[in-house]
Amino acid sequence: RRSSDLQEYFERMGTDPTRWGKPFAALLGALDAQLDLNIAAIGGKDSMSGTFEKMDVPPTLCSFAIAPGKASEVISPEFKEAGHAIRLVSCDPHDTAALTANYDAVLSAIRAGKVVSAWALGLGGVAEGLFKMGIGNQIGTRIDDDYDGNLFAQQIGAMLLECTEDIDLGVKVGDTVPEWVLEYEG
């Protein structure tokens, strides 16, 4: 069963209504996400006293989530071998049905041994993921000439997958190569 925990830090509330609205909006958004994804926040720490003398902390809501599973089904992010297909799985992050369908499809592909590494995209987008996935085993990437995605765009909820075969999931970005390079002609 999946669950999460929340910890929030917010500036001194005072009498400014907008300051009171920030924690309300953040926690309402967290509740919406929990309901949409069928995940409960089973605990939390109230750190709303995020102040020191006259200083305020930036408004922050942290979520810690777990999804217990079998150790044999856990994969790491580094590329495993040259000659594998690299695919990008993404969708509108506000479409929770599509998001959970993607996650379920990726989990099935992992269980079938077709996905051997994965990277959740961050602020640096596809380019960051490809670079960091290659570091561990010094395996490179050759991006397909016809890949037309933005290499640096932030894509919330998207994942790069290293596949042992070219599966029908997401879009193909390229292939892993034995040289530790990041090649793109496009």
Task: Map each language-model feature to its residues.
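A general structural motif
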Residues: 64-70, 93-103, 142-145
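Glycine-/charge-enriched secondary-structure boundary and capping motifs
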Residues: 19-38, 42, 46-61, 108-186
